Amino acid sequence: MRSAFYIFLVVAVLARCSVVAAFTNADDSQLLSKVSPDFAANDMTYTVSRKRLLRVAGREDDDATTDEEDRGFTSIVDVIKRSDAAEALHKLSKASAKKVKKAGKAVKELTAKEKEALKALLALKDGN
C-alpha cells in the first residue's frame, strides 16, 4: 500500500514539474490555449442544432407551455385516484371480481380507459 502511495507521489511531482516548465516557457504556454481550426469550425456548425435540441417542433405559442404546466397538477390527482382505485380493487373478493368481469363483458361499448381498468382488475385478482 505504501509503495503505491510513493509511486503516486513521484508521478504527481514529475507531472507538476513538467507543467510548470511548460508554463515558464512562453512559446509552450500559448500552444495550450490555441484552438485547432477544425474544432472551431465544427463548434460553429453545430451551435444552432444544440440550441434547438430540446424544443418541440410546431409549437410557437406560449399558451401551450401554460397548458402543459396545468396538466402536471391534474396528473398528480389522477395518480391519487388510481391508487385509491387499486386499494379498492384489492379489497374485492374473487366473486365480486367475477361479477365485475361479467358486467364488463355484457357491455359492448367500453372506452379504452374502462378496458384498461378491467384488465388491471383481472390482473390484480389473478395475482392473489
Curated annotation (Swiss-Prot):
Coiled coil residues, start to end: none
UniProt short sequence motif RxLR-dEER, positions renumbered to this chain: 52-71
Keyword Transferase listed: no
Residues spanning the signal sequence: 1-22
Regions crossing the membrane: none
Record keywords, A-Z: Host nucleus, Secreted, Signal, Virulence
Main location: secreted
GO CC annotation: extracellular region; host cell nucleus
NADP in keyword set: no
Location of this chain's protein in the cell: Secreted; Host nucleus
Family under the similarity heading: Belongs to the RxLR effector family.
Function, as annotated: Effector that suppresses flg22-induced post-translational MAP kinase activation both tomato and Arabidopsis. The perception of highly conserved pathogen- or microbe-associated molecular patterns (PAMPs/MAMPs), such as flg22, triggers converging signaling pathways recruiting MAP kinase cascades and inducing transcriptional re-programming, yielding a generic antimicrobial response.
Free-text comment about domains: The RxLR-dEER motif acts to carry the protein into the host cell cytoplasm through binding to cell surface phosphatidylinositol-3-phosphate.
Protein name: RxLR effector protein SFI2
Lineage of the species this protein comes from: Eukaryota, Sar, Stramenopiles, Oomycota, Peronosporales
Designated gene of the protein: SFI2
